[in-house]
Amino acid sequence: MSVAEFASLIALLTSLVALSIDAMLPALPQIAADLAVSDPNDAQLVIGLFLLGNAFGQLLFGPLSDTYGRKPVIVAGLSLFLIGCFVSVIAESFSVLLLGRVLQGVGASGPRTVSMSMVRDLYSGRSMARIMSISMSIFMLVPILAPALGQAIMLLVGWRYIFGTFIVFGVLGLFWLLLRQPETLADEHRRPMQLATLISGFVTVYRSRAALGYSLAIGTMFGAFIGFLSSVQQIFQDTFAVGKWFPYLFAILALFLGAASLLNSRMVMHFGMKKIVRLAMACSPVVSLVYLVICLSVDDSGLIGFMVWGALCFFGVGLCIGNINALAMEPLGQIAGLGAAVVGFFSSFVAILVGIPLGRAYDGTQLPLIAGFAILGVIGLCLVYWAGRDTTQETEK
């Protein structure tokens, strides 16, 4: 398999998470109405519980992939994801729909986590960051197109058929993996799955300043992102009264994320991961603090101001994400599968812990979201500098 095809497969497998989130965003108000959800903010649980299942699923699939190999575990995850989609399709109550979303989240964590391990099996250092960045560039087509796709499906045949789209992509990834991708973990490198092994993985990450610091920094960054994803549809619809334009406005923001990720794939080979991460992580708090002051100084900063702020924050995330994941994984080459699981759990747990309350803090204005970005951005930047002082981390390649 060529590098381009491998990066494309990784992008598809990891994009199931983004697809399962972004395509649902336009449908949240309709789901709340059809399933008699009393509090509109409760509809955000369609996103939050998916991410919760995704976080805990990583602890299962990562160690399993170190024992049984990468391919069988990804197949198991995709199968569970498809089951969750079928549950959501037939759901007649909000609680059953949420059950399906949890199953989807757990299942999607398999390809997401183990795909990172496959990359780590074959690449390291800046080469690994480059593969991740190329994958992210392809992956970014999902948030650009998914909201428009979800809205079109909802308007044409109803929101339940959005899950049918998830099934199509899941089946495509399943057969592509089975037919084209060789196993990347040799038999002699596999280890039996034991509770002590899982605990040792947590201890290894905890003792590594780089792995722990970058994992927590990812959590703060994605926590802000979860808050954004959870409340952005309400902001566009209720605050700015442009709900029907939501997919297209969101696509504009996603373009900045994708462009930054593509730019990073070229920059990282020249400037290194740490420099880019530090610069990118500084973007969110600086821009957010400036925009927060503007919003507090004038009665209405307008949609354009919100879009400029969002575009700059998305651009910073695009520059950062491939590099910071690679930096978190760099000290964990000997436990790639377990390491990816623990890093993913740490970052996802932190993200959910701060992201869901941030989304539910929506009060009819964009102010809680902007303040959350500023605070989490400062914390994330401090963590990045702290992690970068780990003298035991491997030199970037």
Which ranges hold each PLM region?
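Extracellular/periplasmic helix-loop-helix junction of adjacent transmembrane segments
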Residues: L28-F56
